[in-house]
Amino acid sequence: RVMFADPTLEPSENRAIFVDPVNLAVLGDMTVYGTSGILPLRQTIDYLHTSLMLGDIGRLYSELAASWMWVAALGGIALWFYTRPKRRINNRFQNRRRVHVVLGWILLGGMLLFSATGLTWSQWAGGNVDKLRAEMNWLTPQVNTTLSGQHEVMDEHAEHRSHHGGMVMPEMAMDLTQFDGVLSAARNAGIDASRLEIRLAKTRDRAWTVTEIDRSWPTQVDAVAVDPHTMQVLDRTRFEDFPLMAKLTRWGVDFHMGILFGLANQLLLVAFGLALCVLIIWGYRMWWMRRPAQSAVSPVQTLCQSWLALSVWGRGVTVLISVLLGLALPVMGVSLALFVLLDWLRWRAATRVTLAESSAK
């Protein structure tokens, strides 16, 4: 499979030519997606997952889920900790609750992992995550294509960004025989993965890059910069030298995408998704069974009412944490503001009803 950048395709899409390695016959020509070159079926699944096939507007849905999933997971654990009975009680509700709690503990690590890795390539929070990683020196190093200068950084989420993930095709004329020389130089320098990406220089004063793109375990993402005229290796990066957080990001993203451990990884993702659906439905069922039967006996309980019941210090801390999270995770901030507005309107309406009933008495 040989993939080429094509400016007529959508972002992150490439044209793939399938060639028989024995007789060099062309067996196929189709559009693939991302650095790994996934085929149309998985591409459709990916678009459904990231944006519901609605483009940038649809990406708000997945970012909303990633922004709140870790809150729901940790909030559920906190709720269980403060409301768990001191002694084991065997009744229908407690048995249902026990199933929900056990399943929640089992899925907790996955919910935190997928929330964190999903946010790293999200449309709005992703930029803030990148700034944090840059400040903490957690970015992935990239080979320098000039004879002097600083190392650049690599984007682990190139497949989900708004640019092409394949080779850059410069406008200047090129000698196709240079591919063999550059590849040979890279092989001699230790680039031995079966899946490679060769990026041509955009300008004459830049080197070509050869990058391993095998994200399955063990990860092979070493890269070299090669002078296409002298075939000398100018710079290289090795995965074993990456900062720990850069390695964890690489592994986390690849696990999230079902690449790291192949079929086993994908089956685990399917099982996690189904179990998460069961957890959510089970939680709503418990809430439905315990919902107030009569509004007169159980008056409206709103977030505003609970917030007012806190101490002044508690209110201040709650507001501060909410503002900081809203700035770091913009989609969470906007959705929280809308929720608080609706809750406030509901609280005001309930307050008016209570005052009216008191006046009537």
Task: List each language-model region with its residue ranges.
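Short, amphipathic, aromatic/basic-enriched membrane-interface segments that mark the entry/exit
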Residues: T35-L39, V297-L310
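Membrane-interface anchor segments at the N-terminal boundary of transmembrane helices
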Residues: F261-F272
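Membrane-proximal low-complexity regions enriched in glycine and acidic/polar residues
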Residues: V129-A246
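Solvent-exposed, acidic/flexible segments
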Residues: G34, I38, L54, G109, ...
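Internal alpha-helical transmembrane segments
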Residues: T44-L139, V270, I281, W287-W288, ...
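Extended, hydrophilic extramembrane loops/domains of integral membrane proteins
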Residues: P7-L48, G190-E197, A207-M257, F261, ...
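Hydrophobic alpha-helical bundles that form the membrane domains of multi-pass transporters
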Residues: R1-M3
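Short, intrinsically disordered terminal tails adjacent to the first/last structured region
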Residues: L355-K361
